[in-house]
């Protein structure tokens, strides 16, 4: 694992393909259901909100929720995490204990090597403390007398002088301009030891001086007035340690056990009942919470065939992220094992679109491993299926919604007035998708002086209302240009749905006379010279189409079939995809495959399990950038 001095969470190669967000977002776990007697478990390999380092296979956070009578009773929620050994990036310094805590990696202590010895064998976890790792890298960089090494937390390490032969380097550590320490290292002297080459800054914890900053010097040079020093290892811990004591509360959870011998830590909701009710978000611990669907059709009646509720309340765990940076929305871990098949779908992989309130979203990705690759046409298969759902103003009917590469799109009118009014209601028949811009049933009043604002430059102007309020003249504009005008009769006796609805149709992509804008008028009236109208349904789709045609390439995948009968889109990889160590593959545009930078890959078959000992690890993911 590397923690760069400049806080960049994922490599620059990913930044160019990531989504940009300007505020907090949620790292979502797989969708689950509130079913009595069921226990759900998530770990670092299937919940992106927990910390996991795929390269070193480090990260062992777990959360289990035992549901009883629609709630989590006393100790029904259990969070456990375990520290694991891993090498410090500059391996000459030895190893450390890393523990995932509430989704982030923390330092639990040194466990062997030079920094362990220099810290008096002190392990923070035994003192009920952990700390953030601010810097851990072994990249070479050159510093000069006038250009100090910038660390985190306002620290700077400056080279004050180098003797003429380059053997002695005088250093000064400062924080926010205040001198904290000074010393001399000797990286270039004959037979220099690790101690000679390493600058250490310590702070007292648990009766011992623990290393908080370490810098390894590769060499030094002084000549002609120039001073150049090369460092190839930097390590820094946060001085703000986190206290973990039995009984401490974190949201609805409390510390239940801290075991320094096994390096484990457990929290439960002891003495606190957590109920599940629809449309709620409940903080469980720190930034990790539980969100339930705002679900209209909850049905807990038991199906006699399955023995399960017909349609129980849906929920998911999540972690809210606010700190700027680039994050990976990753699916569950996979392994490159010959003959294995790995599947991700909309309810298990948050990189796909899923509307938990409506239970809407049907994307799936199957990866079929053959030796160390995905063979052409059969190795990777992506399928998206359109689903029928009602519009917000339900009298208008239903539409086909299809999720494609993680985003929801309009695939056609399934039934109702808009299907009847559209010459080409099925968008998949034209190999195209359209974005829904507005689908709203909120009541809104506008008048002859203030048009109804729509998306993409459209406005609906109320031109006039007759004295009886029966006839309403409207005009539709786009970017100031008149597109359409009509008269509707929302208030006349016996008015039909068509009488009450303004509809604008036009050509979208390859489809003729598709309903683009619709507004339902609830009533209209006049007051003096002013006309007013109340609307309670607005619908708008984009007038530009996204074409999805057979043969189109999306990353390493190609559209194989667009089926307007089954309302599906299928893509496959036409070319073979090799899965090798330390790779980042653009499988489906922004949906990618990351393989581990794995030092040991052992495909020897274990006689007990029948599986390889330590195959190459990978996961699919989508990158999201949170801007400051």
Predicted features along the sequence, with ranges:
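Secretory targeting signatures
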Residues: 1-24, 159
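Surface-exposed, beta-sheet-biased, low-hydrophobicity segments with strongly acidic/polar composition
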Residues: 22-628
């Amino acid at each position: 694992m590397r923690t760069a001095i400049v806080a960049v969470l994922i490599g620059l190669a990913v930044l160019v393909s990531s989504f940009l967000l300007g505020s907090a977002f949620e790292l979502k776990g797989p969708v689950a259901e509130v079913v009595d007697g069921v226990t759900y478990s998530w770990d670092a390999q299937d919940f992106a909100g927990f910390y996991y380092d795929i390269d070193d296979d480090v990260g062992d956070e777990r959360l289990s929720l035992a549901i009883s009578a629609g709630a989590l009773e006393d100790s029904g929620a259990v969070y456990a995490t375990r520290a694991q050994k891993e090498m410090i990036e500059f391996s000459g310094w030895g190893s450390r204990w890393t523990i995932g805590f509430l989704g982030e990696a923390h330092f639990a202590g040194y466990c062997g090597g030079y920094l362990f010895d220099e810290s008096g064998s002190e392990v923070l976890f035994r003192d009920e403390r952990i700390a953030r790792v601010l810097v851990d890298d072994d990249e070479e960089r050159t510093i000069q007398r006038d250009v100090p090494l910038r660390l985190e937390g306002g620290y700077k390490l400056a080279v004050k002088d180098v003797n003429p032969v380059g053997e002695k380097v005088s250093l000064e550590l400062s924080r926010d301009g205040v001198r904290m320490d000074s010393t001399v290292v000797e990286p270039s002297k004959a037979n220099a030891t690790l101690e000679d080459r390493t600058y250490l800054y310590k702070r007292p914890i648990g009766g011992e001086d623990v290393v908080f900053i370490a810098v390894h010097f590769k060499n030094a040079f002084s000549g002609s007035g120039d001073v150049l020093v090369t460092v190839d290892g930097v390590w820094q811990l946060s001085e703000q340690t986190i206290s973990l004591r039995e009984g401490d509360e974190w949201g609805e959870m409390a510390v239940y056990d801290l075991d320094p011998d096994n390096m484990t830590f457990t929290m439960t909701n002891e003495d606190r009942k957590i109920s599940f009710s629809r449309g709620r978000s409940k903080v469980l611990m720190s930034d990790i919470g539980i969100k339930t669907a705002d679900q209209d059709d909850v049905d807990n009646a038991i199906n006699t065939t399955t023995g399960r509720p017909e349609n129980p309340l849906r929920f998911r765990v999540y972690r809210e992220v606010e700190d700027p940076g680039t994050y990976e929305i990753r699916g569950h871990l996979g392994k490159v094992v010959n003959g294995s098949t790995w599947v991700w779908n909309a309810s298990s992989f948050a990189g796909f679109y899923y509307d938990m309130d409506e239970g809407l979203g049907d994307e799936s990705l199957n990866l079929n491993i053959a030796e160390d690759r995905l063979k052409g046409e059969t190795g990777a298969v992506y399928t998206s299926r359109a689903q029928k759902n009602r519009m917000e103003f339900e009298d208008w009917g239903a539409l086909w919604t299809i999720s494609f590469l993680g985003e929801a799109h309009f695939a056609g009118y399934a039934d109702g007035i808009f299907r009847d009014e559209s010459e080409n209601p099925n968008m998949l028949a034209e190999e195209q998708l359209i974005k829904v811009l507005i689908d709203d049933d909120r009541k809104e009043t506008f008048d002859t002086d203030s048009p109804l604002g729509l998306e993409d430059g459209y406005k609906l102007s109320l031109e006039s209302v007759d004295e009886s309020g029966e006839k309403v003249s409207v005009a539709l504009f786009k970017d100031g240009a008149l597109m359409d005008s009509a008269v509707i009769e929302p208030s006349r006796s016996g008015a039909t749905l068509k009488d009450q609805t303004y509809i604008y149709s036009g050509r979208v992509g390859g489809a003729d006379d598709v309903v683009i804008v619709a507004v339902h008028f609830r009533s209209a009236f006049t007051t003096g010279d002013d006309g007013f109208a109340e609307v309670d349904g607005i619908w708008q789709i984009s007038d530009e189409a996204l074409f999805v045609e057979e043969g189109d390439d999306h990353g390493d995948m190609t559209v194989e079939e667009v089926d307007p009968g089954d309302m599906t889109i299928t893509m496959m990889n036409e070319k073979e995809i090799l899965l090798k160590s330390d790779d980042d593959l653009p499988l489906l545009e922004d949906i990618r495959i990351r393989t581990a930078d794995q030092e040991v890959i052992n495909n020897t078959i274990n006689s007990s399990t029948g599986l390889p000992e330590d195959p190459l690890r990978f996961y699919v993911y989508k990158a999201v950038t949170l801007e400051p």
